[in-house]
């Protein structure tokens, strides 16, 4: 790192570090053996719980110890009051801050909430606020988004009220903040599907037109980001869109989208001298749909595949295979 003085490791310092490392390893192995022995002996006590805390702070990915911890808590549940459960949530949060992508921590937190002595909406609404803060720190954390869906589902179940529209707006905020947030796009897919299935969309055609405008804007914002293109591919092929729009409306949407993609690709060529790989890939998808609908006046698939061979040589064999199929 620039500006940071490199530490000079003398033989004595290396020896001291080796001694310290050996002690840490010994202590960890001793603690692990101790806790596993207590588990095997089915010791379910507060002291055993403390030992699991100590071990999980050293290794939060030790799933067997999380399982043992839950067994202890379940055994002592009748003696445990709300302050204990609050402290347990604090303990888990402390670990999540340092290890936000360890599944077992998220899993345990969910278990604690499900076994919390009261099932009031406030508990889950507070948890939603906690998830919001965690996603502010790492907006693309897959575990955080998955956990959020579970929390929202519990709030909806308790209150008997859908939060789909609020969650849709939340994805918009997150995507606007960072268009490459794949997790937010993925969440958007699920919410739109659910809203249509549950009849939560009033003017469905207008909703789709608004969404396609949002997509086009996203393409122009960052044409290199694959998250946008994955979403586009889902959107144009989804039954929700195909069945809501009539044939002419659907074809017009596809052709308008194609014109915008061609414009983006031409801008890319003018700016960098290179084709945009994602533009070419989605143009192929669009051509396949238009050809299937017998609405393709001029076929350019072979041209796009030849251009992809040049622009994306790592996948050359795939494009050659597709080129053979198109001949």
Swiss-Prot record:
Its EC number is 2.5.1.60. Belongs to the protein prenyltransferase subunit alpha family. The gene is BET4. Heterodimer of an alpha and a beta subunit. It catalyses: geranylgeranyl diphosphate + L-cysteinyl-[protein] = S-geranylgeranyl-L-cysteinyl-[protein] + diphosphate. PFTA repeats lie at residues 44-78, 84-118, 123-157, 163-197, 207-241. Keywords: Prenyltransferase, Repeat, Transferase. One of its GO terms (molecular function) is Rab geranylgeranyltransferase activity. It comes from Saccharomyces cerevisiae (strain ATCC 204508 / S288c). Pfam families: PPTA. This is Geranylgeranyl transferase type-2 subunit alpha. GO terms for cellular component: cytoplasm; cytosol; peroxisome; Rab-protein geranylgeranyltransferase complex. The keyword DNA-binding does not apply. Catalyzes the transfer of a geranyl-geranyl moiety from geranyl-geranyl pyrophosphate to proteins having the C-terminal -XCC or -XCXC, where both cysteines may become modified. Acts on YPT1 and SEC4.
């Amino acid at each position: 790192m620039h500006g940071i003085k490199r530490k000079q490791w003398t033989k004595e310092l290396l020896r001291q570090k080796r001694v310290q490392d050996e002690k840490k390893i010994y202590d960890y192995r001793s603690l692990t053996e101790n806790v596993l022995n207590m588990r095997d002996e089915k010791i379910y006590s507060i002291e055993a719980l403390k030992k699991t805390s100590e071990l999980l702070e050293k290794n939060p990915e030790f799933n067997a110890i999380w399982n043992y911890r839950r067994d202890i808590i379940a055994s002592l549940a009748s003696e445990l009051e709300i302050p204990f459960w609050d402290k347990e949530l604090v303990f888990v949060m402390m670990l999540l801050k340092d290890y936000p992508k360890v599944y077992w921590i998220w899993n345990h937190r969910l278990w604690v909430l499900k076994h919390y002595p009261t099932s009031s909406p406030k508990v889950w609404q507070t948890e939603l606020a906690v998830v919001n803060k965690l996603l502010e720190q790492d907006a693309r954390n897959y575990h955080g988004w998955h956990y959020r869906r579970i929390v929202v589902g519990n709030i909806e179940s308790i209150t008997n009220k859908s939060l789909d529209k609020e969650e849709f707006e939340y994805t918009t905020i997150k995507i606007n903040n960072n268009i490459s947030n794949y997790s937010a796009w993925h969440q958007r897919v699920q919410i739109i599907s659910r809203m249509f299935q549950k009849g939560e969309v009033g003017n469905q055609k207008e909703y789709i037109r608004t969404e396609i405008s949002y997509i086009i804007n996203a393409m122009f914002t960052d044409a290199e980001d694959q998250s946008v293109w994955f979403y586009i591919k889902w959107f144009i092929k989804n039954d929700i869109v195909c069945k809501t729009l009539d044939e002419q409306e659907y074809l017009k949407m596809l052709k308008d989208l194609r014109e915008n993609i061609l414009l983006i690709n031409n801008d890319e060529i003018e700016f960098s001298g290179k084709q945009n790989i994602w533009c070419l890939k989605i143009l192929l998808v669009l051509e396949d749909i238009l050809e299937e609908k017998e609405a393709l006046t001029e076929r350019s698939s072979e041209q796009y595949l030849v251009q992809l061979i040049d622009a994306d040589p790592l996948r050359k064999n795939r494009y050659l295979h597709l080129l053979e199929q198109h001949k």
